[in-house]
Amino acid sequence: MAVRPKKALVTAPAFSEYERALGTVGAEVQYYRLKEEQDFRIQEDILEQITEDTDMIFLCNPNNPTGQTTEKELLIRVMNRCNKFGTILVLDECFIEFLEEPERYECRGYLTQYPNVVIIKAFTKIFCMPGVRLGYALCENAALRKRMRAMLQPWNVSVTAQEAGVAALVDCEAYLKRTERIYKKRKVLDDRADEKAWSECMGIGSKLYIF
């Protein structure tokens, strides 16, 4: 890792690779536990767990595996809290394009104001390229970007991944519109889920991670 946090905060449940990455540098991992009675959504009380000892936070929006979203207003308060303590906030937005209104949640417009924020994005999810590892980070902090580059492996993006990325960008708007049309058809799946009494486990924001 480009940053070696001593103490970090992750949600539980969350994508397991966050904790794994933190473990490689011996960081103490603390958990903000998502509760079923709150629909597994992040609440205001997460701010109380961000202290001067918190070096890094990982948040995923929409969350993996619950699919629940966090409103931008709360994320801004989290960013302000992190800014106060010099905490690095890593926002994973790899699934955000699957949301009906992604612009309502994405935070790239705040990067200049909050240089301690790093946004993670990926081609893998939205362009259906499983197994092709192609992702990127957005960050306004030049010093942090330099440290991240220094930690990259040589040839960290394969030629195959590069070609796939270029091909995806050629007609990306049309592809995203097709994805949007498919997304809007999810009501059929919702109705079937209700018939099977699955509505409780599927009553989530983006409904991406059930299968």
Predicted feature locations:
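PLP-dependent aminotransferase class I/II
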Residues: 19, 116-202
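Active-site pre-lysine segment of PLP-dependent enzymes
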Residues: 23, 41-53, 65-89, 93-126
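Structural motif
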Residues: 9, 56-60, 90, 136-138
